[in-house]
Amino acid sequence: MKRESYQAEMFNWCEALKDQIQKRGQLDQFEDQIDKMIEALEDDQTTEEDWYKQAAALYRDITESDDTSERRAYVPIGKHVLPKLPYKYSALEPYISRDIMILHHTKHHQSYVDGLNKAESELKKARATKNYDLITHWERELAFHGAGHYLHSIFWFSMHPNGKRRPTGALFQMIDLSFGSYSAFKEHFTQASKKVEGVGWAILVWAPRSGRLEILTAEKHQLFSQWDVIPLLPLDVWEHAYYLQYKNDRASYVDHWWNVVDWREAEKRFEQAKEVVWKLY
């Protein structure tokens, strides 16, 4: 996307944001931040990266202001919510179509949120009544829908039309240490993604027990993978992530996905994840 096109999209986003927070009665609270965002967009010396960082900070502040202090501290049982995307549904075209993004986000991810909330609520009811007849079912539902919700909540923010297509800094160095080179990592991750059996994910993770990165795959969301790791960069290879556009050609979807990957989220997660280091075995 050219600078002018992204700039126009950001201007529209700022105006829509103003309307939204005005309806919530919070315009006075955030008007200065939005105006500064608009000034940055008009400044020829600022970059798309500057705009992204400022918009992300503004979005975070507004989102957090809409939560209660309890909600910020933890998610009450059965109260998980669908995260909003940091870009338009059409933003990842031509690599991922608008129709796929709408269906994937509003239907499939929402179903995982709903399923997780249902499972948590049923397990809470079981504890209260001491009736554990269906515990096996609800624990499976908890694992499936919970993993689906959490992985998607990373996945959306690991893509962007103007994202960082190659990691740098500490994460790049750890990729080099863990896989030998970035190109070796990319080939490994690509091949793992293409060869997940059935439906599932390929995930770059930090492994605190080994002190390095690993590439894992998971069938569905939760099967045949490892514990004690922290996901950094996931790629969804369920058919609903690509079938409307690529039909049964998962390989083409995976190859094109590298055109929308955004390493900024993975780098941010790694900065926190690398602080978790267990005794090495």
UniProtKB/Swiss-Prot annotation:
Lineage of producing organism: Bacteria, Bacillati, Bacillota, Bacilli, Bacillales
Stored SUPFAM superfamilies: Fe,Mn superoxide dismutase (SOD), C-terminal domain (SSF54719), Fe,Mn superoxide dismutase (SOD), N-terminal domain (SSF46609)
Binding site for Fe cation: 104, 152, 236, 240
Comment on bound cofactor: Binds 1 Fe cation per subunit.
Stated role: Destroys superoxide anion radicals which are normally produced within the cells and which are toxic to biological systems.
Protein name stated in the entry: Probable superoxide dismutase [Fe]
Family: Belongs to the iron/manganese superoxide dismutase family.
Any one GO MF annotation of this record: superoxide dismutase activity
Keywords for this protein: Iron, Metal-binding, Oxidoreductase
Protein species of origin: Bacillus subtilis (strain 168)
Cofactor(s) needed by this chain: Fe cation
Pfam families: Sod_Fe_C, Sod_Fe_N
